[in-house]
Amino acid sequence: SLSISSFDTMELRYYPNTMDAQNGVNVRAYMGRLLDGLKQYAEDFSPTENESLMLIGNAGLGKTHAALAIAGLVLEQGHDVIYVSSPDFFGKIEATRFDPSGDADTLLRTASTADLLILDDLGTEFVTPYFITVFYSLLNNRLGAGLPTIITTNITDLSLIHI
């Protein structure tokens, strides 16, 4: 939740204080610099000037915590933030796509126009042709409007390219 997920509650001590053999950097120091950059991103947030981000890594590294921390700071500045679990969001859209109430359209319109959209856990949803169409449309609309999106995912290989 936002109340417990802030940059102040991110604990660097949970990251190993060792060198990463593949990248040749100290893991804890690298994560500290990364979190500083994410905090700066949030503090300087502007819906039309910020880039989109993709936070990639194994489960338990703090991607969701960092995304919620960004959301909290951006909300404090008075911007609109939509934070959704990707499988829940796309599942709801798929479940209501034939509903005459227009819930799916409302959800998509809201997500397409928010100052910041955060899609958490992309890649854990059931991938269907409809999902791919909606996902592409959502990102395309946001890119066209110049609005940033933050995506978190546990997928660390190239399988996201197939989505």
Where are these regions (language model features)?
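Pre-Walker A (pre-P-loop) alpha-helix and adjacent loop at the N terminus of AAA/AAA+ ATPase modules
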Residues: 12-51
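Conserved nucleotide-sensing/catalytic segment adjacent to the nucleotide-binding pocket
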Residues: 101-143
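Post-Walker A helix-loop "phosphate-sensing" segment adjacent to the P-loop in P-loop NTPases
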Residues: 72-82
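Hydrophobic positions on the alpha1 helix immediately C-terminal to the Walker A/P-loop
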Residues: 66, 70
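Short glycine-rich substrate-engagement loop in P-loop NTPases that contacts/grips substrate
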Residues: 80-112
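Loop/turn-to-beta-strand initiation segments
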Residues: 79-80, 113-116, 145-150
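Conserved small/polar residues in nucleotide/adenosyl-binding loops
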Residues: 161-163
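Walker A/P-loop nucleotide-binding motif
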Residues: 50-65
